[in-house]
């Protein structure tokens, strides 16, 4: 994901694009060459507005979303700017006689919604409408269909803009466009023009390997083609307006990808200045024309000379933007150094380590094997949204969850990978299985019949019980297993088993595991001998890959993906360089001075044997940190040193002794799982101290901990 990366190329071009927009409204070369001015203002400069749309889409639109907060914030901010701009330009509207028009109220509504109350303000309602359309299209139908729908809208707009002369001669189309023009003066608006650029911006952001060095040549070639085509359209006089061209799309696409090459320090000032300049250039255009020309008698210099006029407008606009930026900056309260995400306790998720583990496991598998990521229980406490939205871009396209509700959440996040539900789903929810295209595990013959009886087409995997004796068909149920292939509403897409003893290298356990493996492969022969296509085969266990790894199957990997073993004593046949992905941390919120003999916590479980410094951490067993680590059974790391847990761990807090650790203060970071200096506490170590396993420890976390993604 790229939303928080810094792209200085985009920041610099924002400023250039703002200057281009000023050029569109001031025609800087008109005094010297009408053709040159046309080329500059009607071929080169029009890339500016689509660039702004695409930039907004790049940082706003994503198929991976867990809510609409970013969209809401964007619309709220843009609406506020639009409202201020409308009020700011009322004097100019009065001067131009805007309020003397016929049908004033419906025209004001039309202008506010589509065209802007002053010509150049159309960009703001277009941004609001275009962002909303693009966001919901991508959310509901993914990029391919979203692009198709946005393209259709763009084509409709195209024939109401640059190609209007063609459709005007076709009576039915002319009627259609006349209806459109009763609602909006132009098709260059938030419905027809903006959505496709927002969609493309989001697609670029979500897509890996998007940079191409050949963009220099492509941009030059496309602009040459657009130059010829635009002059042709002008020559035949078929344009109603000149904002929308076919070649504008690939031109802005290549330009934007080129700008992504340039990384560096964020230029927040340039962003704000270019924004203010864009919205205020027309003010100074009017001021230069009216005030300077009439009061200072400089018409020949500031009005009749178009280039000087343009420079004056740009200069005045930039000065105003700098002043406004400085004023707003001085009035804006300074942000605290910490963020809300890390002000209490939090999990750090290292995405680089996650990708490393995926690559390591894939290399350990035979070439025909594939990886299915088990993301149940909030991806083993790592955050289901944070993890799954990272898996697809790095090439993991099979996911497994425990419940239907987990699967539905993934679909609502924007996940399009195959999702297998490992556990039971009530047959009464078959409609949801079908609607969200989830793959259901068939747990026995009776369940199979009930699911088919619901009347919804359901994709399913048959589970074979090879010794776990929980869910699944017996290896003796040949007829019942084969029956699944012939039911009307069940589409068998896979067969899998769950090895119950693959985590052990003891000879008797290895022998036990090998026996059901043979039975499982015997089951796989039944469909083949009956002339049926053998569906995908998968094995449910990380330890099956580590200790046996001899099949051409899909491996369901859970704990291995997250770089940990179940316990510190586990040994595996295959040694892999896996790296832990989650690190639990909390901030010191208070330091208490406890005199010798003083106590801390419930039941006075800790009594100080000396004058002590006790640090209070805002994390407890409600955050998933085990209560049986109380009273010195574990420790945390602060400043690279061990701080023992004292007293009983509470629901929301715990106390640690920092008497022997220098420079501990409020705000110091305590590491409960992770590395600090030369010291390290691993998840298996904490789990062992709590007399548990890593799976349980991690899956109990996340529910109210903030998750910070590090890449």
From Swiss-Prot:
The keyword Ribosomal protein is annotated on this UniProt entry: no
Positions of the catalytic residues: 376 (proton acceptor), 602 (proton acceptor)
GO biological process terms, semicolon-separated: D-alanine biosynthetic process; response to antibiotic
Gene3D superfamilies registered for this protein in UniProt: Alanine racemase, Lyase, Ornithine Decarboxylase, Chain A, domain 1
Modified residues (N6-(pyridoxal phosphate)lysine): 376
Cofactor: pyridoxal 5'-phosphate
Topology class, membrane: Multi-pass membrane protein
Cytoplasmic membrane side: 1-14, 59-78, 139-146, 210-241, 328-711
Entry keywords, A to Z: Antibiotic resistance, Cell membrane, Isomerase, Membrane, Pyridoxal phosphate, Transmembrane, Transmembrane helix
Region (Racemase): 336-711
Molecular function in Gene Ontology: acyltransferase activity, transferring groups other than amino-acyl groups; alanine racemase activity; pyridoxal phosphate binding
EC number(s) stated in the UniProt entry for this protein: 5.1.1.-
Stretches in topological domain Extracellular: 36-37, 100-117, 168-188, 263-306
Binding-site residues, substrate: 470, 651
Location (main, coarse): membrane
Superkingdom, taxonomy of origin: Bacteria
Any GO CC annotation of this UniProt entry: cytosol
Enzyme class: isomerase
HAMAP family cross-referenced by the UniProt entry: Ala_racemase (MF_01201)
Protein name: Amino-acid racemase
Naturally occurring in which organism (per UniProt): Enterococcus faecalis (Streptococcus faecalis)
Gene label: vanTG
